[in-house]
């Protein structure tokens, strides 16, 4: 019986961990998952690339309507983009607020347009 209780507890913790991991992609109605994948003109792992990613994370995640901000580095040879940013907005109004926010506008003008060589922007809502 004790062994059954132990396994039950392990499976329960595993299910909770899986649920927490999947929760970040479980959009609610009206929420928007905003992602951008991009290239920088710097060698991977360079001080310049690291600075861009850290600055982008600090600046963009500091905008009040941004939720669940994450920065990513590409690991697959199937994709030509090196990096990614991802975030969630509660609704279209928050997404618009983000796009018009002075910190976002400044980051795009001062850093993005000068340092990003290529990008693809993706915005998703739940399909059903």
Which residues does each predicted region cover?
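Conserved short beta-strand edge segments in small beta-sheet-based binding/regulatory domains
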Residues: 108-123
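C-terminal structural segments of small proteins and small subunits
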Residues: 95-100, 105-111
């Amino acid at each position: 019986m004790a062994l059954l209780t132990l396994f039950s507890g392990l499976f329960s913790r595993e299910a909770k961990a899986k649920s927490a991991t999947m929760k970040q992609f479980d959009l609610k109605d009206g929420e928007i998952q905003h992602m951008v994948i991009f290239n920088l003109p710097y060698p991977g792992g360079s001080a310049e690339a690291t600075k861009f990613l850290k600055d982008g994370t600090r600046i963009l995640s500091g905008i009040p309507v941004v939720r669940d901000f994450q920065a990513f580095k590409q690991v697959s040879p199937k994709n030509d983009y090196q990096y990614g940013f991802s975030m969630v907005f509660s609704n279209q109004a928050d997404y618009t607020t983000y796009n018009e926010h002075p910190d976002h506008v400044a980051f795009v003008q001062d850093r993005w347009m000068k340092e990003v060589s290529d990008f693809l922007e993706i915005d998703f809502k739940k399909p059903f």
